[in-house]
Amino acid sequence: MALLKVKFDQKKRVKLAQGLWLMNWLSVLAGIVIFSLGLFLKIELRKRSDVMNNSESHFVPNSLIVMGVLSCVFNSLAGKICYDALDPAKYAKWKPWLKPYLAVCVLFNIALFLVTLCCFLMRGSLESTLAHGLKNGMKYYRDTDTPGRCFMKKTIDMLQIEFRCCGNNGFRDWFEIQWISNRYLDFSSKEVKDRIKSNVDGRYLVDGVPFSCCNPSSPRPCIQYQLTNNSAHYSYDHQTEELNLWVNGCRAALLSYYSSLMNSMGAVTLLVWLFEVTITIGLRYLHTALEGVSNPEDPECESEGWLLEKSVSETWKAFLESLKKLGKSNQVEAEGADAGQAPEAG
């Protein structure tokens, strides 16, 4: 028994074809939107690729770009099919291809849904990518004279200013690395010598942060150095003082930015997916309604359209059976090829 059977007369078939034609061209515009979102995300990721781990993947933006292009192609073709469906002579040339085309549309909808899920699930991989990338970026902050790394200081400073953040997880991350280049250290100074000798790795570590960590909204002049030394500053207690530095770490700030971006893109892609599913269902009804016309010479006659020719369970069983037959035929062909090679070897 057919699933979700609907009766169509000529007027209903024409309205369905016209409605699907309009929806397909709207979906072409939606495909352009998805393509644009993927391109925008790719550009945003590349802009900050210097503070991301090298293993950072562009799978999601690339997938959005591909899905956007495919959406434009498939829906343009579907729009042409719906337009020609109004003319029996023109529809005849599409008739043999419509069923395979619907199967491709189902696969496209599955792929689009998976890409939508990836948009919402990207946060986990992005978090580890940012953690490693920012850590390495801060490590190279001082290498202003090293080719290939001389830009890192500007990159980190601009990042901290733009996103109002400091360090990887917080401002104390700067205490654990030497962010001042040896070029600007006076090695004849006793303080510099003592600091380097007191460190196992021979690094010059200070309880200070770069200028880009300063919050300009603070009424107090920025305290960059000796942040943990209360006596170095008037009326200051680092444990209770609300520091005039950015409180948030850059990993959390970037993660929040990209997560909101990905959630918005995921929501848009989900709406487009629902729209595409609706179009595919409509195409299925149009296909079965036109196939069910008993007398092609009488376009006014009624016909029946359905979503599935059989029930869900019967359709699933038939699908599994077809897979088994396909597997057996491949196995027989492989055995035949092996048998043909054996006499040649003899």
Swiss-Prot record:
Listed GO biological process terms? cell adhesion; detection of light stimulus involved in visual perception; photoreceptor cell outer segment organization; protein heterooligomerization; protein homooligomerization; protein localization to plasma membrane; protein maturation; retina development in camera-type eye
Q: How does it sit in the membrane?
A: Multi-pass membrane protein
* Record-linked InterPro entries: Peripherin/rom-1 (IPR000830), Peripherin/rom-1_CS (IPR018498), Peripherin_LEL (IPR042026), Tetraspanin/Peripherin (IPR018499), Tetraspanin_EC2_sf (IPR008952)
**Tissue expression from the record:** Retina (photoreceptor). In rim region of ROS (rod outer segment) disks.
The residue ranges crossing the membrane are: 25-43, 62-80, 100-123, 265-290
Positions of region (Interaction with MREG): 341-346
For this UniProt record, the keywords arranged alphabetically read as follows: Cell adhesion, Cell projection, Disulfide bond, Glycoprotein, Membrane, Sensory transduction, Transmembrane, Transmembrane helix, Vision
Q: Which of this chain's residues carry glycans?
A: 53, 229
**Where would you find this protein in the cell?**
Membrane; Cell projection, Cilium, Photoreceptor outer segment; Photoreceptor inner segment
One Gene Ontology term of the molecular function aspect: protein homodimerization activity
The terms describing its cellular component in GO are: photoreceptor inner segment; photoreceptor outer segment; plasma membrane
Looking at the keywords, is Aminoacyl-tRNA synthetase present?
A: no
Stretches of the chain found on the membrane's Lumenal side: 44-61, 124-264
Chain ranges on the Cytoplasmic side, renumbered to this chain? 1-24, 81-99, 291-346
Q: Which family does it belong to?
A: Belongs to the PRPH2/ROM1 family.
Assembly with partners or alone: Homodimer; disulfide-linked. Forms a homotetramer. Forms a heterotetramer with ROM1. Homotetramer and heterotetramer core complexes go on to form higher order complexes by formation of intermolecular disulfide bonds. Interacts with MREG. Interacts with STX3. Interacts with SNAP25.
What the protein does? Answer: Essential for retina photoreceptor outer segment disk morphogenesis, may also play a role with ROM1 in the maintenance of outer segment disk structure. Required for the maintenance of retinal outer nuclear layer thickness. Required for the correct development and organization of the photoreceptor inner segment.
Q: PANTHER family annotated for this entry?
A: PERIPHERIN-2, TETRASPANIN
Please identify the protein, giving its name as recorded: Peripherin-2
Q: Which organism is it from?
A: Canis lupus familiaris
